[in-house]
Every structure is written in structure tokens, then in C-alpha cells.
């Protein structure tokens, strides 16, 4: 083998081999940039096309369902397909057209260097690619980076083995060769700190190693590579400098007010005027960090700005920016000075800012067929162009900040919307009192568990077309997790029963279930019977406002005063709930603690559930419902049209949104994919 290496080295000096190495680098650069800059935006755009949606819906909801659950799970593994894509692309660029081991070794290093511009392009915030949110590019960035590290490692290992077996280790003293070792060390450190266990527990270490290692690897690869990679280096440095310039130019200092909400949530407020880039769409996000007290610390923060992303819970028209923050390691200092960057737009495909008509122009604005186009609505600052008829949102924990602005905007623009919020503690409901909004469609699920917020999840039940015919399927109960089934399959509905209160025994029973769920029997009520919910399932606070006499005529008495409408009476008054005293087992101390009664203000229109939500066929049928032609107590006018053409056309105007913990977002994505629905996620996962 050593002789073959030596003969190959002699042959590799030829011009033909050098051209092959250069060609593989240019091909890798073109393919990677083409995939990122062209294929990704085109795919995102084509998903919005009605014909493409019809084909994808038929493939996901009808064809794939015939091949069993294992086949569907295999298709839904985005991580697997991304890994295969980049491994096949990198391997093909390094191997195809050459059988010489030395040429292949050199091409491995060349391809790794050629992939770096595309790797850095995927990290730009915000992404310059149309129809693309930069958060959605992070999985692709991770796997492309792993392929780069793998190819660089194989390249270095083969050359090191050759130097060792041929007695030429002295060549490692050359600047170009030991700079290659420096580049490899930077790659390995980046890969090691990028492991989930390190990245989540030691994020600061991960960030600093990632930031420093990026610059070290770019410079070391430039010195090491032969033939030179000047073009790659120019692209890499340009992308990194652009990202630094964009961040610094949109960074400002603000004073933050911290409002405690519960043991797990806090509300941060600062003036909108302090943002350099004002938000245009709801549910954008900003990146924020506590300003260092010393000048050297501030300089360091500008060089290596580690900022935390938070979704803006307020509307773009509000004068105050509000952030709902989970209490963790992020420093919360009332009236403290913070650096804030942004805002970054959410890039939700069905929503766009209205285009103002130019003075003197008679061209009408494009009207959405799903919205009321009254002059008063179009003149409102809350009016947006919305190409959706129904929106189902699922959020967990502090990600309610993503759902609240959308809930208000969609309700205002006449879009049917449901917002499912999964939280751990009912005290988190205090956050609703900080927002004056239309909460119609908000459903809250209190799990009552002691898990971390990132462990919040949602269950989903597999379904088929037979469930729309009312067939009872007792096997569905076995598909639910223990936490879902023990709460009687609390699937959200649009027509559940109501109650005015809950006694102390039932609430205490719920709390006990939360802490001993593993010892309970799995019981599940059939999904078709959920519309007749019993009184232990749901609290619908709209029942406090009786409508029995709403159609009666109003006959004012003589000298009676008409009600005066003020700005405080625009929204319906909230209801107050006094939870009973219940016991909670403290895992840290090992003792049972007792909470005191506390009055909580619950806005009207909110539905409160105890347990873990389950996305089921009933939610899918809600997505199929049409507009009601008038008020109805039975909702019989809102029936789904199961005809194939109308069925797909209706679903093309339905969107499913998810935000929050990764497990919750992934479960919602799979449910939406099985149903062939549009899906958008907002997850700041690391």
C-alpha cells in the first residue's frame, strides 16, 4: 500500500489531476450554493401553489396512509433525508470521475472547503432567501457542517497515515500542513460542542467555540489549501463580515421593565422606539442580552454578541414591546440596560403587510377572498392581507407570545382561528391579564406536571376517512400516551359543554393525577363522544354571559340612561376564578406543600382544560368546516364537504402553526403532514 501511495503522489503532480481537484471544488461550490439559493426558495414557493398542494395532499393523506405507519415515519424523518442529501452530494463531488486514492484524498479536502460558503449562508439572520425563515435553515446548516467536518477528518487522517507509513512526518512542520491540523482541530471542537448534550447544557461554551472556531477555520483553510482557495475565502469573509455589520447596525440599548407573572414566566417591556428595525408583521422576534457594566465587557459583547431570541408578544402598532420570557439562566434585571437587535420578521406565507395605495393611483388593492373588505377594516392598522380561511395554532409554555398576536390579528380580520396553549402551571394564566385582546378561540391545557418547559408535548391520534362517518374505534385509545389517556382524551372541540366552576375535590384529584400519572389506569372516552363533554372536562367562561334573552327587543324605561361606551368597555369583562386549596409534592425537599387560594382573572372566551391535549380527527374536521351562514346552536351549518375536489380546495386554505418545545412542534408537524395540511413552525431550538 505504501508503494501505491508513493506512485500516486508522483502521478498527482500532473496538471490533469490538479484540474480534477479544482473542478471538484467548483462543482461543489456551485451545487451547494444552487441547492441553498435556488432549490430551497423554489420548493418553499411551490408549496403555496394550489396544484402542487393538491398533489402533495394526495400523496401524504391518501397514498402514504396505505403503506402503514412505519413507511410514513420513514418519510417524515427530515433529519435522515438531510443527512443523506449532503452525504451523497459531498461523496459524489469527491469520488466521481477519479479512482486514484491521492486524488480522492485531495478532493475530499477541496470539497469540504468549497462547502463552507453555503454553510455560512445558511446562518445569516435574517435569511436573504425569499419565502424562507432563517430558523428553518438551521437543520440544513447542522448537517452540512457535519459533512464538512467528516470530509476534513477523512482528508487529514489519510494524509497523516501516508506521512507516518512513508517516513515523511517531517513535512508536518511546513506552515501549510500544520495549519491544516489547526483547521481540523477547530472543526473537531465545533463538532464536539455541537452535540445536543453539550449544546443545551453549556450553550455559552458552544457559542464561543463556534464563533472563534469559525474564523480560525476560515483563515487556516486558506493558508493550508493547495491550489489556493482565494475565491472561497473571499466569500466566507464577506458573509461573516456582513452578518457582523448587520447585527451591529441594528443593535441598540434599551431599559427593560420586568413584570413577574409566575414561578416560570416573566414579562419584559421596553419602548418600541428603541428598536432600530420596527416590526411590520405580528409575532416577529428580537434578540436581547444584558449589557455589561464595564467598557471592556461591552466591547467583548459587540465582538461576540451572544443574544437570546424572544418572540414579540405585542402588536406592531403598540408603543411598547412585550416579551414573554421563561425564567431560566437568562438574567432578568428590572430597569436594567439591555442590548436589543431586531426586529426579525416571522415570514409566515399566508400573511403579508397590506400595500398602501400610492397617492393619485386608481389601482385597487388586491383583495383576499377570505376577508371582509370594508373601508373601515382596510383603514385599520390591524388589517393584513391574509390568504387563509382557517388557522390552527399549537404553542407550549412561553411560546404563547407567538400565538397571542396572531390570535388577535386573525380574529380581527375575520379568519377562523384556534389557539391551543399547553402550560405546566395554572398560574401562568396570569399572563393573559397583561394583554387586552380578543381571546376567542383560545384553549388552554394545564398539564400540572413538574417537567421543564422544553419537555412539554402534545399527543396526536392517527385517523382515516372512516372516522368522519361516525364509526367508533376503541383501538384509538391505545394510541394515546399515558398522560393523554388518563385525562379522558381531552381533545379540543368547538362545541364542548360548559360549567361555572369546579369543586375542590375534583381539582385536588387533578393535581394528584399530575404527580402520579404513571400509576393510573389508562382510560379513554371515544373521540366521537367528546362533543358531549362532562362537567369535569372543560371550563368555558363564555357561559357566564347568558344569551337566552339576546334576541329580545330592548324597551328603555322612561328617564333611563343609555350605557356609555368607553375605551375600557370595548372588550368584554373578565371572569374571576378562585382555585381551591390543593397539595403539591415538592421533589427537592420531599415534603408536601399547600398553596393558598388565589383569585385569577380569566378573559372571557377562554376555554380551560386539565390534562394534555390530543390532536385528533375532530381537529381535522374542524379544519374542513365551512363558514356558517348564520348563528346556530348546533353548528349544523358548519359541515365539512367530503367531496374530493372541494375537500382539497378547502384544505389549501388551512394552515397549522406550531411554536415552543421541540417535541410539541415535531408532533404537530407530523399530524399536519399526515393530514396533508400547510404547516409553519417557529422554534428557537439549539
Curated annotation (Swiss-Prot):
Might you give the EC number(s) for this enzyme? Answer: 1.16.1.7
The question of whether Flavoprotein is a record keyword is answered with yes
Query: Record's InterPro entries?
Result: Fe3_Rdtase_TM_dom, FNR_nucleotide-bd, RBOH/FRE
- Locate the Ferric oxidoreductase domain: which residues? 108-666
Please provide the record's keywords in A-Z order. Answer: Electron transport, FAD, Flavoprotein, Glycoprotein, Ion transport, Iron, Iron transport, Membrane, NAD, Oxidoreductase, Transmembrane, Transmembrane helix, Transport
GO MF annotations in UniProt: ferric-chelate reductase (NADH) activity; ferric-chelate reductase activity
Tell me where the transmembrane regions lie. Answer: 23-43, 79-99, 111-131, 147-167, 178-198, 205-225, 256-276, 392-412
For the keyword Transmembrane helix, the answer is yes
Which SUPFAM superfamilies has this protein been placed in? Answer: Ferredoxin reductase-like, C-terminal NADP-linked domain (SSF52343)
Source organism, top-level taxon: Eukaryota
Which reaction equations make up its catalytic activity? 2 a Fe(II)-siderophore + NAD(+) + H(+) = 2 a Fe(III)-siderophore + NADH
Function summary? Is required for the uptake of Fe(3+) ions. May participate in the transport of electrons from cytoplasm to an extracellular substrate (Fe(3+) ion) via FAD and heme intermediates. Involved in iron homeostasis.
Question: What is this protein's name?
Answer: Probable ferric reductase transmembrane component
* Species name: Eremothecium gossypii (strain ATCC 10895 / CBS 109.51 / FGSC 9923 / NRRL Y-1056)
Its gene name is: FRE8
